[in-house]
Amino acid sequence: MLMPKRTKYRRPHRVSFEGKSKGKNVIANGNHALVAKEGAFITNKQIEAARIAMTRYMKRTGKVWINIFPHLSLTKKPLEVRMGSGKGSPEEWVSVVKTGKVLFEVKDTTNSSKVETEALRLASHKLPIKTKIVKKGAEI
C-alpha cells in the first residue's frame, strides 16, 4: 500500500477538496489520462485497486503513471467512545483530489487507443468520484 515514509505531523488537520486543482492538470507522460470531474479523498487502497485493474488489462504492453500519492492521514475514534479526550488514531492514508487533476496516465507500446481507454475505464470504476478520459493535447 502507498503511504509516506515519514510525516511532520502524525494527525494533521483535515484539508478541503473543494475548488479546482492548481497543479498536475496537464498530461505530461502518457497518451491518455484519467481526470477528476469532482473533488474527494481517495484512499491508498482505491489507488492500488485502480493500478491493478489497469496493469492486468494491459498485460505488459503499456506503462502507467500514477500522479497522486496519499500524503494525508485520516483519523478515527473507536466505536462507542464518548466525545472529547483528544483526536482519534490515524486510520487510513488519503490523497486530496480536486476538480481537473490528472490522476492516472497511460501509454500503450502498440499505440492502441482502444487498449488505453479501456484500461482507464476499468480504473475509473474503482474510484469514488466521477472521472473523464482525456487524450493528450485535448482540453481538460
UniProtKB/Swiss-Prot annotation:
It holds the Pfam family Ribosomal_L16. Transmembrane segments: none annotated. Keywords: Ribonucleoprotein, Ribosomal protein, RNA-binding, rRNA-binding, tRNA-binding. GO terms for cellular component: cytosolic large ribosomal subunit. SUPFAM superfamilies: Ribosomal protein L16p/L10e. Part of the 50S ribosomal subunit. This is Large ribosomal subunit protein uL16. It comes from Aster yellows witches'-broom phytoplasma (strain AYWB). The gene is rplP.
